[in-house]
Curated annotation (Swiss-Prot):
An example Gene Ontology CC term for this record: membrane
Gene3D superfamilies: P-loop containing nucleotide triphosphate hydrolases (3.40.50.300)
Organism of this sequence: Arabidopsis thaliana (Mouse-ear cress)
Keywords: ATP-binding, Membrane, Nucleotide-binding, Phosphoprotein, Transmembrane, Transmembrane helix, Transport
Similarity comment text for this entry: Belongs to the ABC transporter superfamily. ABCG family. Eye pigment precursor importer (TC 3.A.1.204) subfamily.
Locations listed in the record: Membrane
Pfam families listed in its UniProt record: ABC2_membrane, ABC2_membrane_7, ABC_tran
Name listed for the protein in its UniProt record: ABC transporter G family member 15
Source species, domain of life: Eukaryota
């Protein structure tokens, strides 16, 4: 796209062939507000922004902290929060279009990756999850290797990403891996939220250089960036400079220095242009200047010709904003937006999420999750070691418990400890599961796979570890304590442990989906498990529990009560115990658990186990429902919040009086405003612009 003339700065109108190869994104009068329903004014995050992004070019959105960089990026990508309202025009190739999974990709600021996988494994699994199932392994492998080469990851392709116990790739390499995952499906538009944040200058350069290579492939790249080095800044084609939600400059990056010079704020020769731009519009530098002057207040400060030292930042910013509105750059941008809005481009092929089949996704997710569990020391291996140590301790403390009268209490105590406290140890896997949930949320938002396939794959991959925990714990304690002999009793004992541990795992999944915070999740999970143990019939017998609430229904929906009752029946029924006083008849196990512990023996122990299984299924279904509600309720709440906001703003004269919105509020509500939606259904906010 060459310029027609240096004076106009306008590019040639793209042809239909060019349109079919790329995505031209344009926005006009884009405004984002957070309503204040009190007496205070409505807060504007973005104010009537105009701009466009074209294929083959990389745009930088710059500005100080709080200037609206991420808000603008989220507005264009359809990821705005539910408590904000967006108005304006957003056009793709001159018309309304869905910003869908196959069209756009979004790289978040945080690199959400499984640290136990290598770079190649991470990209390969992502490819199998999303690429068409009819593609051969060789074709998928070629795409993976090509992506690795494109992002310059060939030197670290066989190194693990890294986590708390394994050192992995560098921060810049992690960022490039995140970018590689998003460009596997060759999206037309790539959004990035501060990809250079936290990176050194060399790593930041390699990341932006990789983005430049992606843009050259005919894709539209839009990235927010905070304060790039001069070498990194030179890689950007276009610049959108923001301050307090207002446009300070939009145009070619190399022309920004000229604009600042024309406005009376030239960039010194040896100063980084991006540093100079931020110095002009960042009010924090006023405090720095005042501090420097204050430290030299004893000496007479000589007059300086530097306008940055003589003018307040608010004055500089206001002058820049006004100069830009009247500049040739703003006129050129509006003219280009008009051209792009009148383009009759070709319809773009949009893929609806992943193109892999459900079964392929299940196999891929199960394999990836199983490898992650095998390599993550804290997921299951540490717990297995703890279970072995605790099982040996329990077995030796209750060794050969016997059949005396005192052994009754010993058997009950041992069974209650195994059912309650040993299953409580499953809470130790919560941190690792929380990290996996972060990956799920990120991939689900990008349309990799569905909720059901994730839940099923997680249980299948964890099944061997849960079996190992149950068999190891059951074998050690059963043989050392010498519970009732017989293989069927041993099998029931192990199954009871297996399903009890599975219930706790499922409960912690529900907690993680509702309270996705490490510390609060542990506290919540521990509290719930504590209630389950208190109502299990071990600390207080079930018949003695208060009938209201605790007995009915809490004890019936507590897996602990069913697991303990089944354990008592499995161990006591068929045994006889010595009486308290010599000469009295022996006590049968049935009398002990029914008369002493209040356990009904009218139904089989297998029904108790079936109740535990039913609770397990209910927790898994609840996990599914919570995830779906989070997913489905988000867009609905956004729409409700948007309508409520616009109704309230319509009655707010302070909102109408602001000069930044030239259109009436009723016009915005009826013609321009659309409900805020998720990325899968965010549409352009209007038909082509009419002048």
């Amino acid at each position: 796209m060459e310029l027609e003339g240096s004076s106009s700065g306008r590019r040639q109108l793209p042809s239909k062939l060019e349109m079919s190869r790329g995505a031209y994104l344009a926005w006009e009068d884009l405004t984002v507000v957070i309503p204040n329903f009190s007496d205070g004014p409505t807060r504007r995050l973005l104010q009537r922004l105009n701009g466009y992004a074209e294929p083959g070019r990389i745009m930088a959105i710059m500005g100080p902290s709080g200037s609206g960089k991420s808000t603008l990026l989220d507005s264009l990508a359809g990821r705005l929060a539910r408590n904000v309202v967006m108005t304006g025009n957003l056009l793709l190739n001159g018309k309304k279009a869905r910003l869908d999974y196959g069209l756009v990709a979004y790289v978040t600021q945080e690199d959400v990756l499984l640290g136990t996988l290598t770079v190649r494994e991470t990209i390969t699994y992502s490819a199998h999850l999303r690429l068409p199932s009819d593609m051969s392994k060789e074709e998928v492998s070629d795409i993976v290797e090509g992506t690795i080469m494109e992002l310059g990851l060939q030197d670290c392709s066989d190194r693990v990403i890294g986590n708390w116990h394994a050192r992995g790739v560098s921060g810049g390499e992690r960022k490039r891996v995140s970018i590689a995952l998003e460009i596997l499906t060759r999206p037309q538009i790539l959004f990035l939220d501060e990809p250079t944040s936290g990176l050194d200058s060399a790593s930041a350069f390699f990341v932006i250089q990789a983005l430049r290579n992606i843009a050259r492939d005919g894709r539209t790249v839009i990235s927010s960036v905070h304060q790039p080095s001069s070498e990194v800044f030179a890689l950007f084609d276009d610049l959108f400079l923001l301050s307090s939600g207002e446009s300070v400059y939009f145009g070619e990056a190399k022309s920004a220095v000229e604009f600042f010079a024309e406005s009376g704020f030239p960039c010194p020769k040896k100063r980084n242009p991006s540093d100079h731009f931020l110095r002009c519009i960042n009010s924090d530098f006023d405090t720095v200047t005042a501090t420097l002057k204050g430290s030299q207040r004893i000496q007479e400060t000589p007059a300086t010709s530097d306008p940055l030292m003589n003018l307040a930042t608010s004055v500089i910013k206001a002058r820049l904003v006004e100069n830009y509105k009247r500049s040739k750059y703003a006129k050129s941008a509006k003219s280009r937006i008009r051209e792009l809005s009148n383009i009759e481009g070709l319809e773009m092929e949009i893929r609806k999420g992943s193109e892999a089949t459900w079964w392929k996704q299940l196999r891929t997710l199960t394999a990836r999750s199983f490898i992650n569990m095998c390599r993550d020391v804290g997921y299951y291996w540490t717990r297995i070691i703890s279970y072995i140590v605790v099982s040996i301790s329990v077995g030796t403390i209750f060794y050969d418990v016997g059949y005396s009268y005192t052994s009754i209490l010993a058997r009950v105590s041992c069974g209650g400890f195994i059912t309650g406290f040993m299953t409580f140890m499953s809470i130790g896997g919560f941190p690792s599961f929380l990290e996996e949930m972060k990956v799920f949320y990120k991939e689900r938002l990008s349309g990799y796979y569905g909720v059901s396939v994730y839940i099923l794959s997680n249980y299948i991959s964890s099944f061997p570890f849960l079996v190992a925990i149950s068999v190891i714990t059951g074998t050690i304690t059963y043989n050392l304590v010498k519970f009732r002999p017989g293989f069927s009793h041993y099998a029931f004992f192990c199954l009871n442990i297996f399903f009890s541990v599975s219930v706790i795992e499922s409960l912690m999944m529900v907690v993680a989906s509702v309270v996705p915070n490490f510390l609060m999740g542990l506290i919540t999970g521990a509290g719930l498990i504590g209630i389950i143990m208190m109502t299990s019939g071990f600390f207080r017998l079930l018949p003695d529990l208060p009938k209201i609430f605790w007995r009915y229904p809490v004890s019936y929906i507590s897996y602990g009560s069913w697991a303990i009752q089944g354990g008592y029946k499995n161990d006591f029924l068929g045994l006889e115990f010595e009486p308290l006083f010599p000469g009295e008849p022996k006590m049968t196990g049935e009398e002990v658990i029914e008369k002493v512990f209040g356990v009904k023996v009218t139904y089989s122990k297998w029904w108790d186990l079936a109740a535990v299984v039913a609770i397990l299924v209910c927790y898994r279904l609840l996990f599914f429902v919570v995830l779906k509600l989070r997913e489905r309720a988000g867009p609905a709440l956004k729409a409700i919040q948007a309508k409520r906001t616009m109704r309230n703003l319509d009655r707010r004269p302070s909102f109408k009086r602001m000069p930044s919105l030239s259109l009436s509020l009723s016009s915005m509500s009826s013609r321009r405003h659309q409900p805020l939606r998720s990325l899968s259904s965010q549409e352009g906010l209007n038909s082509p612009i009419h002048y």
